[in-house]
């Protein structure tokens, strides 16, 4: 699968703008540690984080189609949770499914020819069962979109409805990687930065947040660069780049989602209630 210039630009956006949003995870972890041995505990958390990411990365190459399915599923929840928390509505799960499924369910199906090639590169072969499962996801997503759109229009939350509709049309007309990069970088990552900065500015120093984010971003880029050059010795540049970016992103999403959606958001909510 050859990539156009616009596709390379989209991948660059994902790597240099989207990926760093997860680099704040060290500052997030540090902010939740209250004991005196904060550095030692932070090191332990980061080690577990790295082990989870590495384990998923290795599992991907043993069970690629299954791993891709898991990546799509957790991305629906992770993206949807971030969008819901940014602009809550009455129907929580239709909101999560509708927004989280745009780039993970709707995009693959509406751009099936292009995404089939992408999935084949990521899994080293065809994935017919995955497409059958995506059709089931699409049914759930369609119901979620209908319920969510009705509720947002009924309650006059027009900006939420228009964002969803705009993304649906973008996925229809734009190249798949452009749609993904647009959502991942300028909606999901921007909201994540805003949420984390707001939560941490009273708990952590700005220097520590920025410094740790820079260190982890640079480390991720160096590791990713090494993986890319290794893969490029075995396959063409475009395929090596796609595997590096998306399999690497999937591996990092697992510990990132656990930390953000299952630990940090509930932790932040408890602090907000106490205050």
UniProtKB/Swiss-Prot annotation:
The keyword Metal-binding applies. It is found in: Cell membrane. GO terms for biological process: carotene catabolic process; retinal metabolic process. Could be used for high retinal production. It comes from the Bacteria. Binds 1 Fe(2+) ion per subunit. Its main location: membrane. Its cofactor is Fe(2+). Homodimer. This is Beta-carotene 15,15'-dioxygenase. It comes from Uncultured marine bacterium 66A03.
